[in-house]
C-alpha cells in the first residue's frame, strides 16, 4: 500500500516505512504516540526531590525510594510516605507503638500525600536504635471524612506475610505487613549477564518457585537456587522467567491476583533469598525476567490496593463505570490515566530492576490492557484487519493503557540500555507493539506467539497424524508481523493448568503411568509420543520465532497438569509440584526427552538460528509429510509421516558444499532408533536447482524424525 510520505507524521514515519499497510492509520498511530510522549514530558518536567526537572528513570527511582517505609542509617529515623487522597487523617501503627492509633499521626499535603518520621529510640544499654524493629508488623490507619477509621497494609510495603494460625483465627487470614530492615543487607556478587538485544538468542525457562519441588509442598527460593538453577544451566537455557513473585494472598491464583506489588512473595522465603537466587543465576550467565502483573490487581481490601483510602477509584477506575473491574478475572483495573498510578507502576518496575536485579519483564495480560473490551467476547475475535486495532471507530483501544506500556518500555531502556528485555503477552496481534519507540512503536522486544500452542493442541485433539497439513503447520509457525519478534513455544503454564493437558500427556495419555520404564519393550503409543514431542518442540523452536520458551518440567515431558491447593481439591499439593524425580530415574524414558531438549538448546547456542531473519521454507510436502527450510545457514528437515521413511530424498539447499548432521532426533540417547549412521553421513550438494534452491542434497530421513544439518566448515567439535 502506498501513500504520500509527506502526509505521514514524523513521529511514526519509521514504522510506516517498515509496514506500508500502516499508512492509512499514520495519524492514529501518531496521536497514540503523542499521548505517551506528552505523559513523559509531564513526568520529566515535574520536580524531583531536589526541586529540579527529572528523567523518567529518576522519577521512578525517586518514587520507590521515598514512598513507603525507609530507614535512614545516618539518623536512624524511619520515614513513611503514602498517597491516600480520600483520607483526612492518617496514622502509622504497629507493634513498635503497641498499635496506638494516635501515637504517630501523619502530615497531609494538598495532594493527599501523607508523611511522618519515626525517631530513633534508646535501648536499655543507652544505644540508639531504629524506632521500628526489623520484621515487626505495621499498618496504616486512615480516618475518613465521616469520622470512621479503616486499616490497611502500606501500599509500598516490601514484605507481607501470612498470619499464624492463632492470629488468623482471631483476626482473619489477611496478610500482615512487616518492616523489612535487616542489620546486614544482601550484597550482589555477580554482574548481570551481557545481552545484545539485536543479535543474541533468548532461550527462556519459565518457572514458578513454589511448585519447583517433587514434594507436595511450597518450594522455597533456596531450594530453587540449589536444585533447579543447576538443571536450567545444564539444559542450556540463558534466561529464566519467574512467575508469582509479586505477593499474592491467594496461592491458587498462580500469582496473578497481586495484593502487594513491592513485596516479593514470602511463601517462598525472604527478600534476601530471592536476591541470592537472582545473583546465583547471573553467576551462571542466566538472565532473570519477572512476570509482572500490571494489567489488574486483587480485589482484596484489607491486604491489597482495593479501596485503599476508602474510595473505589484511587488506583483504579470507579466501580460506577464499566471499567472498574475485569469481567472474567474478578479483579480491579488500573486507571492508567492518573499521574499517581503511573508513578506507582513505573516505580514498581524500577524497584525490581534495582533492588532485585531483574533483567526485564514479561508483561501479563497486555491484551486486556490494550482494549476497553479486554479481548473478551466479540471484541476478542481478532481477524488481523488493521481497522480492529487502528480505526478510531472500531478499535476500542485504551489509549492511556497503551501510553503507560510505551513509558514502561522507555523506562526499561533507560535503566537497562544494553540488556533490558520486555515481552508482551498479547494474543490480539496489535501492530507496532514490538517495534522500537523511536520509530513510533510501543517498544516491546517480543510478544508471545500464543497461536502456536493452540495449533498443536488442536491437531493432537482433532486430527490423525496422517491428516496433518504441513502447509497449515508452516503457515501458523511463520505467521508473524514483519520486524516484530515473537517468543515461540509449544506450551507454557497456561497449557499445564488443571482441565488441560501437557503436550506429553496429549501424546501418550495414561501410557505415561505404565509404559515409560525401560525395563520393558516400548509401546507404539510411547514411541509415537516421544518422537512427536521432539519434532513439535524442534520445529517450533527453529521456525516459530526469534526466542523460545519452555515451562519447567515440560522439557522432559512432565505428565500431569497443575492444580494449586484449593477447596475443590481438599487443599492438596499433589498437582502443585514438578516431578523432577521422573527425569532423575535412569530406568524411565523421561531422560530421553530431557537429553534431546538439552541438545536442542546447545545446538541453538552453537549455531544461533533464533534472533535471525525468518527461515526460507523450500518444502511442505503434504503426501510425504516432509518439511524443509533453511535458517541462518542451517538446513532443517522434518519427516512427520507416521510410517514412511525415505531414502535418497531430495532436499533443496542454497549454499553448495558438504553438509553434516548437527542434531538428529532419532539418536538412541533421545529415545530414537539410531537408524542413521552419522559417522558415515556426509551430504554433498548437486549443482542443480531443486525447490527454488540452487542445489540439492539427498538424505535418508526416517519416519517421525528431524535432522539439522550444517556445512562441514561450520560444524563445531561435539556439534
From Swiss-Prot:
Key words of the record: Cytoplasm, Glycogen biosynthesis, Glycosyltransferase, Transferase
Encoding gene, per UniProt annotation: GLC3
Entry's Gene Ontology molecular function annotations: 1,4-alpha-glucan branching enzyme activity; cation binding; hydrolase activity, hydrolyzing O-glycosyl compounds
GO cellular component terms, A-Z: cytoplasm
Reaction it catalyzes: Transfers a segment of a (1->4)-alpha-D-glucan chain to a primary hydroxy group in a similar glucan chain
Biological pathway: Glycan biosynthesis; glycogen biosynthesis
Recorded family membership: Belongs to the glycosyl hydrolase 13 family. GlgB subfamily.
PANTHER family, per database record: 1,4-ALPHA-GLUCAN-BRANCHING ENZYME
Domain of life: Eukaryota
Gene Ontology BP annotations: glycogen biosynthetic process
Subcellular location: Cytoplasm
Active site residues per record: 364, 425
Keyword Transferase listed: yes
Site (Transition state stabilizer): 494
Entry binding sites for (1,4-alpha-D-glucosyl)n: 99, 139
Main localization category: cytoplasm
Protein name: 1,4-alpha-glucan-branching enzyme
Pfam families: Alpha-amylase (PF00128), Alpha-amylase_C (PF02806), CBM_48 (PF02922)
Tagged with keyword Nucleotidyltransferase: no
Assigned EC number: 2.4.1.18
Known role: Glycogen-branching enzyme participates in the glycogen biosynthetic process along with glycogenin and glycogen synthase. Generates alpha-1,6-glucosidic branches from alpha-1,4-linked glucose chains, to increase solubility of the glycogen polymer.
Amino acid at each position: 500500500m502506498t501513500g504520500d510520505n509527506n502526509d505521514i507524521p514524523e513521529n511514526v514515519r519509521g514504522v510506516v516505512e517498515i509496514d506500508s499497510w500502516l499508512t492509512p492509520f499514520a495519524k492514529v498511530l501518531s496521536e497514540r504516540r503523542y499521548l505517551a510522549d506528552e505523559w513523559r514530558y509531564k513526568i520529566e518536567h515535574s520536580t524531583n526531590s531536589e526541586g529540579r526537572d527529572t528523567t523518567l528513570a529518576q522519577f521512578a527511582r525517586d518514587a520507590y525510594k521515598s514512598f513507603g517505609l525507609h530507614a535512614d542509617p545516618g539518623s536512624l529515623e524511619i520515614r513513611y510516605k503514602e498517597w491516600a487522597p480520600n483520607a483526612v487523617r492518617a496514622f502509622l501503627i504497629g507493634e513498635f507503638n503497641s498499635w496506638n492509633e494516635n501515637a504517630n499521626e501523619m502530615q497531609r499535603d494538598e495532594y493527599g500525600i501523607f508523611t511522618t518520621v519515626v525517631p530513633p529510640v534508646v535501648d536499655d544499654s543507652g544505644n540508639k536504635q531504629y524506632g521500628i524493629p526489623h520484621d515487626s508488623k505495621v499498618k496504616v490507619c486512615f480516618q475518613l471524612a465521616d469520622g470512621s477509621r479503616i486499616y490497611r497494609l502500606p501500599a509500598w510495603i516490601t514484605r507481607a506475610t501470612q498470619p499464624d494460625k492463632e492470629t488468623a483465627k482471631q483476626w482473619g487470614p489477611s496478610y500482615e505487613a512487616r518492616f523489612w530492615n535487616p542489620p546486614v543487607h544482601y550484597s550482589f556478587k555477580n554482574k548481570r549477564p551481557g545481552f545484545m538485544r539485536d543479535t543474541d538468542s533468548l532461550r527462556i525457562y519459565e518457572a514458578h518457585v513454589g511448585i519447583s519441588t517433587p514434594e507436595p509442598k511450597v518450594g522455597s527460593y533456596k531450594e530453587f537456587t540449589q536444585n533447579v538453577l543447576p538443571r536450567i544451566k545444564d539444559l542450556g537455557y540463558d534466561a529464566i522467567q519467574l512467575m508469582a513473585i509479586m505477593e499474592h494472598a491467594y496461592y491458587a491464583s498462580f500469582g496473578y491476583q497481586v495484593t502487594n506489588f513491592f513485596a516479593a512473595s514470602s511463601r517462598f522465603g525472604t527478600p534476601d533469598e530471592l536476591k541470592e537466587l537472582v545473583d546465583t543465576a547471573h553467576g551462571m550467565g542466566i538472565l532473570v525476567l519477572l512476570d509482572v502483573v500490571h494489567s489488574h490487581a486483587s480485589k482484596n481490601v484489607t491486604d491489597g490496593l482495593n479501596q485503599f483510602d476508602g474510595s473505589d477509584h484511587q488506583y483504579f477506575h470507579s466501580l460506577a463505570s464499566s471499567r472498574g473491574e475485569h469481567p472474567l478475572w474478578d479483579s480491579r483495573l488500573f486507571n492508567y490515566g492518573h499521574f499517581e498510578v503511573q508513578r506507582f507502576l513505573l516505580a514498581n518496575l524500577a524497584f525490581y530492576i534495582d533492588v532485585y536485579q531483574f533483567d526485564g519483564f514479561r508483561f501479563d495480560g497486555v491484551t486486556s490492557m490494550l482494549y476497553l473490551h479486554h479481548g473478551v467476547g466479540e471484541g476478542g475475535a481478532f481477524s488481523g484487519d488493521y481497522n480492529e486495532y487502528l480505526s478510531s471507530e472500531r478499535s476500542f483501544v485504551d489509549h492511556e493503557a497503551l501510553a503507560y506500556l510505551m513509558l514502561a518500555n522507555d523506562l526499561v531502556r533507560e535503566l537497562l540500555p544494553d540488556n533490558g528485555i520486555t515481552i508482551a503477552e498479547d494474543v490480539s496481534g496489535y501492530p507496532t507493539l514490538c517495534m522500537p519507540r523511536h520509530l513510533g512503536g510501543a517498544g516491546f522486544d517480543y510478544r508471545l506467539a500464543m497461536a502456536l500452542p493452540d495449533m498443536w493442541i488442536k491437531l493432537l485433539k482433532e486430527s490423525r497424524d496422517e491428516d496433518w497439513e504441513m502447509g497449515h503447520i508452516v503457515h501458523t509457525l511463520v505467521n508473524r508481523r514483519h520486524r516484530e519478534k515473537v517468543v515461540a513455544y509449544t506450551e507454557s503454564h497456561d497449557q499445564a493448568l488443571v482441565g488441560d493437558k501437557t503436550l506429553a500427556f496429549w501424546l501418550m495419555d495414561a501410557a505415561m503411568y505404565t509404559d515409560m520404564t525401560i525395563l520393558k519393550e516400548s509401546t507404539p503409543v510411547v514411541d509415537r509420543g516421544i518422537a512427536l514431542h521432539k519434532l513439535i518442540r524442534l520445529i517450533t523452536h527453529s521456525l516459530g520465532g526469534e526466542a523460545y520458551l519452555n515451562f519447567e518440567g515440560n522439557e522432559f515431558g512432565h505428565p500431569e497438569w497443575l492444580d494449586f491447593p484449593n477447596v475443590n481439591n481438599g487443599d492438596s499439593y499433589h498437582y502443585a509440584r514438578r516431578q523432577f524425580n521422573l527425569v532423575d530415574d535412569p530406568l524411565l524414558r523421561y531422560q530421553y526427552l530431557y537429553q534431546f531438549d538439552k541438545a536442542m538448546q546447545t545446538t541453538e547456542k552453537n549455531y544461533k538460528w533464533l534472533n535471525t531473519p525468518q527461515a526460507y521454507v523450500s518444502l511442505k510436502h503434504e503426501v510425504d509429510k516432509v518439511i524443509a527450510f533453511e535458517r541462518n545457514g542451517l538446513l532443517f528437515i522434518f519427516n512427520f509421516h507416521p510410517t514412511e521413511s525415505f531414502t535418497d530424498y531430495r532436499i533443496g539447499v542454497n549454499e553448495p558444499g558438504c553438509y553434516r548432521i548437527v542434531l538428529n532426533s532419532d539418536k538412541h540417547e533421545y529415545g530414537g532408533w539410531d537408524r542413521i549412521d552419522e559417522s558415515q553421513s556426509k551430504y554433498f550438494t548437486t549443482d542443480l536447482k531443486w525447490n527454488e534452491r540452487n542445489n540439492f542434497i539427498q538424505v535418508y530421513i526416517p519416519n517421525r524424525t528431524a535432522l539439522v544439518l550444517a556445512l562441514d566448515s561450520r560444524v563445531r567439535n561435539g556439534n
